[in-house]
Each structure stands twice: as structure tokens, then as C-alpha cells.
Amino acid sequence: MGNSFRVDRVGMEIKREVNEILQKKVRDPRVQNVTITDVQMLGDLSAAKVFYTIHSTLASDNQKAQTGLEKATGTIKRELGKNLTMYKIPDLIFIKDESIEYGNKIDEMLRNLERKD
């Protein structure tokens, strides 16, 4: 029971820190418009799925952001090591968060339905 609380807390802390690191420490223009939306930790804290959105709908920008995040992983982990009191910093797996786009499509469909009425 107590362990799941710790896992959630570590995930929230990593989300906050990674957003800050991307803003202040990573100089790569490919990740300028990236926002971390969620972090899901493995139960043993060995890895973190880091979900992100990008403020662009271009597929090329999405690919550039993914590449930029992967290139910045070393810097991000190093900064996490300075800022977090953890024995081992988890491996970071960056995944594009599709839920916001999906929600926007649903909203648009609902608006279109309202117009037809």
C-alpha cells in the first residue's frame, strides 16, 4: 500500500522536474514547445514512461520533438540526479500523449453535431 503512494509521488516529482529541466537546461529548439503531461513509474522505480504533448500538429514537428527528447535524455537524467534524492534515476521512455488530441477531436465532433441541429 505505502509503496504505490511512493511510486505516484516519485512520478509527480519527475514530471515537475523534467518540465523545469526542459525549460531551463535543455537548449535544443526541437523540445521548446514540449510539455510533460504525465509520468507513469514502474513499480520498482527502474523506468518512467514520460508522456508529452507538443504545441504543433505537424508530423515532422512531432518526430523532431521525439528525437530531441531522446537526445536530451542524458542531460535530463543528470539534472534529475542532482535534484532528486534517489539511489538510481529511472530510465526515461518518452511517449507522445495522444489523449489531448483525441479530446480535441471529440470536442470538434460535438460542436459539428450542435451546428447541424
UniProtKB/Swiss-Prot annotation:
GO cellular component terms, semicolon-separated: cytosol
Transmembrane parts of this sequence: none
Disulphide bridges: none
Localization terms from the record: Cytoplasm
Primary localization: cytoplasm
InterPro entries membership: KH_dom-like_a/b, RbfA, RbfA_dom_sf, Ribosome-bd_factorA_CS
Biological processes per GO annotation: maturation of SSU-rRNA
Domain of life: Bacteria
Function: One of several proteins that assist in the late maturation steps of the functional core of the 30S ribosomal subunit. Associates with free 30S ribosomal subunits (but not with 30S subunits that are part of 70S ribosomes or polysomes). Required for efficient processing of 16S rRNA. May interact with the 5'-terminal helix region of 16S rRNA.
Family label: Belongs to the RbfA family.
Entry protein name: Ribosome-binding factor A
Protein source organism: Streptococcus thermophilus (strain ATCC BAA-250 / LMG 18311)
Protein encoded by which gene: rbfA
